[in-house]
Every structure is written in structure tokens, then in C-alpha cells.
Amino acid sequence: MKKKLILVLNCGSSSVKFSIIDVIEGVLYISGIANTINNVSFLKIYDIKKKIKIVKKNISTDSYKKLILLICDLLFIHFNKYLKLIIGIGHRIVHGGKDIKKSMIINKKILLKIKKSAIFAPLHNPYHLIAIKIILNKFVKLKNRNVAVFDTSFHQTMPKKSFLYGIPYSFYKKYSIRKYGAHGINHFYITHECSLFLKKSTNNLNIISCHLGSGSSITAIVNGKSIDTSMGLTPLEGLVMGTRCGDIDPYIIIYMIKKLNFSITQIQKILTKSSGVLGISSITSDFRELEKKYYSHKKAKLAIDIFCRRVSKYIAGYSSLMPKGKLDAIVFTGGIGENSSFIRKKIIKNLSIIGFFLDIEKNLIKTGNNNRFIHTINSKPILVIPADENKIIAKETYNILIKNNF
């Protein structure tokens, strides 16, 4: 049977991740990443099947466009045999606005909606658009086989009592100001993976999914659907993150303008790039480094304590949204959620009140196929499930192409 490969692109302002996946067999062929954009420090492409690695270090590019073009050129030069088997291209899109509720074939109308929503995802949507336009020109035969998979789609099931803010209703009606959420692709994936591990249908599954990384969000999922999530109009709301502030008193912004004479541009940069655990610790946004300094650096300890406290508060709060108090599991995912036993321990320590207890030994074992559960025998389930957004994007892309008779 002819292989059906999907090229997946995940573009942000500071990194580009890409992969080629056999959507039928679920096999990863190519995995690549470029970190930072201006003066890119490295670009790595791995051929998983043949165990070949291409590394470009100290690459100097003066534009995002040139970086995407470089990635395309390297793929065509070294991996053209795989490109010939590609049947579609999936693009992760962070924000789709209020109207988009599912993955869509990319056309002029969809591009316009992505552009319109860029105000809510300035670190992502503009870069998605640059990449899409280049891909459409480079892969001409697949021009009608590009699919946008939206992070916000999974959260479109939230009720108004979850997504509306306590501001005049007219702001929602006139300007679409409401909670949209993020990380929906992975929260969707976690929902389906968790249903397999718990041997329950997604329609009967009630969980709290904790995507913890440099950007973090928590989602309350009832009967397999998102009913509330910590990120809001933008990915700035919610948990304290690597460099993002999370929930703050809105008057802080007014104070910064009126009393401290900060400009809107300065405030945006502070809240998105200089806050979070970086701002609190004054040393780094890297949670691994903060963990190492936890017992020797007061502000490193403070940053982690504040992060974990906020996560615990959200989990406890979302547990109250479960029908008849029935919460099937807490799931940890994302770079921190998957890899930091230390942070998981600190978070769960505060949740015995809602029936969750950590098995210390299981928590320390590196997550594998046989080690997803990290709770004690008298606890409700606690799982660790590695994120795999690319797998979902590839499947969604394939499904949309099939539905549209491609």
C-alpha cells in the first residue's frame, strides 16, 4: 500500500517545528526544529528511519521568511523521496477567533480569519501566515491540500458562563472579546489518550488536563469536551508561565501607564517576555535551572512555589465543575508536566483534599508505555501522558482531506 505522509508545521516567533508522519501507520519519518529566528542558533533535521541527522549551527537569517525557505530547501535537497509521498500539509494555528470550530482547508477566507485573529496571538498567527504563503508556493501540487488545525477549536464547546468576562456584554457582541483558550490540540489528544488508559469512552470522561511548559494551561474536560480553560482572550491569561504573567489585576496596567509612564508596547513586552518565573526569579525562565537552584536561591524557590500554587488552585477550582463531583483523573502533559517529578510532587501535595495522592516512587520513574499512572492505591488516577500535537495535526489533516474528497 502506498504510504500517505503528512507534513506538519508548527511555527512561532522564536521557533519552527516540523515533521513528516505516516498518518496510516502512525510512523514518524522526519523531525525538525529551528530555534530562535534572528541569528538562528541551530537547525536540526532528523531522519528517524535511517538515523540520519542534519545540523546547521550559527545560521544567520535576517528574516523569518528566509528561515522557512531554508527549511524547505533542506527538505527538498535531502528528503525529496519523502516529499514525493506527501498527500497533505497540516499547519498548527494558535488562534482562529470565534467563528472557527474545526480544522479547515486553507483558502483566502481562512487566511483572512487567521490574519484577523493575529491581534490575539501576536507571537504566533503572523508567523503562521508567513509560513503558509511560502509553503503554498513551494508545494504547488499540494496547494489545495493545506489544512489549518486550530488550538482554539477544542475550546469552542465552553458555555458562555465560562468564556465571558465581567465586562459589558456589548464588548463580546461588538468586538468578540471573550475567552478562547489555547493548547486545544494537545488537550484534545490527552482526552483521547486518557480514555484509552482508563478504558472509558470520551463521552463519559471527566478529567483535568494540565499542559505545563514554557507556556502552560489547564483545561476542565467534561464528557470529553472542554468546559473551561485557564488561558483567555490570549495565551497571556491563567497560570504563571516561563515569561508570561498569567492572571493579574487589570489595574496594574492602568497604574503602569498613568503613574509609571510605560507605553503600551513596553507593557506588552514586560507582560509577555519579562514576567512569569523569569520576572519573579530575576534569573531564568528555564524551570530546569530553577529546580537546580530551588534550595540555594530564594527567588528561584519563590518562582517555583508561586507556579505550583497557581496550578494547584486551578485544579482544585476546576474539580468543582465536575458533574456530581465525578473527576476521573488529573493528567500532566507538556515539557514540565511530563519531565519534572519535582514540580508534579509539589502540585499534588496540595490536592489531597480532593482525593489525589502521589506515589513517590512511581513519580520518579521516567514515563514510558508501562508507566503512565503515578498515584497511590487509595487515590483517584493521576497520569503522565507525553504531548503529541503533531500526531493529532496529521490525523486531522488527513481526515479533512478525506471529507473533502481529496
Swiss-Prot record:
GO MF annotation terms: acetate kinase activity; ATP binding; magnesium ion binding
InterPro entries in alphabetical order: Ac/propionate_kinase, Aliphatic_acid_kin_short-chain, Aliphatic_acid_kinase_CS, ATPase_NBD
Disulphide-bonded residues: none
GO process terms (BP): acetate metabolic process; acetyl-CoA biosynthetic process
EC identifiers of the protein: 2.7.2.1
Reaction(s) this enzyme catalyzes, per UniProt: acetate + ATP = acetyl phosphate + ADP
Keywords: ATP-binding, Cytoplasm, Kinase, Magnesium, Metal-binding, Nucleotide-binding, Transferase
Family that this chain belongs to: Belongs to the acetokinase family.
UniProt-recorded name of the protein: Acetate kinase
